[in-house]
UniProtKB/Swiss-Prot annotation:
This is Accessory gene regulator protein B. Its main location: membrane. Belongs to the AgrB family. Pfam families: AgrB. Essential for the production of a quorum sensing system signal molecule, the autoinducing peptide (AIP). This quorum sensing system is responsible for the regulation of the expression of virulence factor genes. Involved in the proteolytic processing of AgrD, the precursor of AIP.
Amino acid sequence: MNYFDNKIDQFATYLQKRNNLDHIQFLQVRLGMQIIVGNFLKILVTYSISIFLSVFLYTLVTHLSYMLIRYNAHGAHAKSSILCYIQSILIFVFVPYFLINIDINFTYLLALSIIGLISVVIYAPAATKKQPIPIKLVKRKKYVSIIMYLLVMILSLIIHPFYAQFMLLGILVESITLLPIFFPKED
């Protein structure tokens, strides 16, 4: 166990005793804290590297666009925490880093984003085993995903093309995570 896990266990035990939580509630509290700390550390590492490479703003634009769609569309997750770190750094830091030095035609990115929209229309929301989506929310999440995707695309036509490419990158990455190839076949 590392330092953070020990502190999480100590605090979860304290909350269990103080609030008279049963073992299941204790495990839920501990898991919630582990997720919060893990996500905070991933964000800290990713954005620290982006600051070091002077691409913080581009990372932020890409990540925010991605999250606007991801919140309702869901999608595939990395198989492990370390893979999540690697994927986050590659997608949200290094791709924008290289994108600022490569002249990619905006029309090409827009065309790819339209293909991504098709992915969102067909596959969103994409549930996982660990994060199933209640049936009553599926239709609403699909509509919101499509609307948010279209809004980001429209906004990308209005703002400066340099920043728009990072917005399109974010939504394109999210649309890729919805594809069935990233979900294992269920038995």
